[in-house]
Amino acid sequence: MMKRILLTCAALLLSGQALADDCANASTQAEMNTCAVTQYQTADKELNETYQNALKRAAPPQQELLKMAQTAWIAMRDADCALISSGTEGGSAQVMIANQCLADKTAEREAFLASLLQCEEGDMSC
């Protein structure tokens, strides 16, 4: 059983590296679309982890403000990316353009929230 788990983990790690290599060499629109979706999913996962850590460290009044800010930020990010990708609406590149936008803005937000974690516990003003 343990051997099976280790083999599965190794396969997942190798497939992640293979995907990164594939993305560096993506040449078709379908490959580029897949890579952009994967990049966004990775950025979103990192953001969610950082957001949960920020919520845990925030004082109760700040937790509510952070939740409100995050909800507003998601709406703005989605609207911005819809606008940015609207020029390619119906085209094969729309998925890539939209997901690159989502990945970039999500990574920026994750970096911002990570900077809040550098503050002393309960102090989000640094």
Language-model-detected regions and their locations in the chain:
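Sec-dependent N-terminal signal peptides
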Residues: M2-G16
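N-terminal alpha-helical modules
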Residues: A18-C126
